[in-house]
Amino acid sequence: MSNKMTGLVKWFNADKGFGFITPDDGSKDVFVHFTAIQSNEFRTLNENQKVEFSIEQGQRGPAAANVVTL
């Protein structure tokens, strides 16, 4: 599934490089790894930050991909 979705960052631990996004459509929270963040700067997210992303099947279930801050 590569449809773009929007959501808010629930939490993100910059030291460990991962967190979760709460999709705007009310679906289950989605895991996000820092490597999925599209940025030329330090790849981190802030709590309650608005993002656009797609969902791909990761090793442990659905994971955010191509994450862009809005």
UniProtKB/Swiss-Prot annotation:
Its main location: cytoplasm. CDD domains: CSP_CDS. Keywords: Activator, Cytoplasm, DNA-binding, Stress response, Transcription, Transcription regulation. The keyword Transcription regulation applies. This is Cold shock-like protein CspG. The lineage of its organism: Bacteria, Pseudomonadati, Pseudomonadota, Gammaproteobacteria, Enterobacterales. Induction: In response to low temperature. It comes from the Bacteria. The keyword NAD does not apply. GO terms for biological process: regulation of gene expression; response to cold. Residues 7-67 form the CSD domain. It is found in: Cytoplasm. SUPFAM superfamilies: Nucleic acid-binding proteins. InterPro entries: Cold_shock_CspA (IPR012156), Cold_shock_domain (IPR050181), CSD (IPR011129), CSD_CS (IPR019844), CSP_DNA-bd (IPR002059), NA-bd_OB-fold (IPR012340).
